[in-house]
């Protein structure tokens, strides 16, 4: 997935972090990808890049979260990159669609938020650091969701009343609300092929 690694590097280098903490995480991600040609693959030991999306309701009042079957906690939609993913944005849109069951998601191709965390249930490795790149996905009016095999439950949560075990999502939700209120210079897309050719600015 060297082409995907190159795309991820280009996207992260072009992204303007909104805070010093996010800038430090971007440096960590870029350094990791520069040092590891397989840094986007789940087989990369120690750490690898993942992608996901926070799904915002059409009225911007709720976010769609999944109760992860292994972690038993509420998360945004996301997961590992796959060889067919043409970009980080395409991977995020694929994961969001697969895990939520929502058709017609519109994904902003510019990264929204970064978060690095250790995961104890990632395949054959006892502990792996996930370098997660999160995007904003907007659900259409009347969106219908479903529970995937990776989840116990999928549910809409008011943006002001997140689950108790998802307090760390607050920063990302706030970033999503701010992004949703600002006219975007990038075109949102519900087409993974289009997302793979979109460039963050």
Positions of predicted regions on the chain:
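Predominantly extracellular/luminal regions of secreted and cell-surface proteins
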Residues: 1-28, 100
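Acidic, metal-coordinating catalytic segment for phosphate/diphosphate chemistry
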Residues: 16-52
